[in-house]
Amino acid sequence: MSTAVKAGIAALVLLAVAGLTMLFMHFWMAPPDDLDLSREKPSANQLYTVAVAPEQEPFDRNTLHAWIATVKAADGSPVDDAKISVDGGMPQHGHGLPTAPAVTEALGEGRYRIEGVRFNMSGWWELKLHVSAAAAQPEPLKDRG
């Protein structure tokens, strides 16, 4: 058997395994029983509370739409100088977002417009916002000498 034929067979086997894995994840991986569908959550480090909502409801699946993120400090004050990156995906299917959403505008009062969001199929999607702002950074240690 030639090397090219072996490589072709290996590629087909790899595709079959990948396809079966995706099929398994799609049909047999159930969302967790305690899935929290709230649109407002504290950040992992408890420095912020972040709320998200679509700019217009209802939004259509498989179309681009915008979301508004509202970022507040732990004391409830709006965070207007945040840098926000957007990530996410479909944990049940094991893939990321089909687009690359990004913050396109700071709206004031801790609100930010995120454009380029598209959910191309029904199911459980996650939007993960990574937030950083100078106001919530820990203060440097001071020399007590």
Regions inferred by a protein language model and the residue ranges of each:
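Contiguous segments within soluble domain cores/interaction surfaces
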Residues: 2-14, 18-126, 130-145
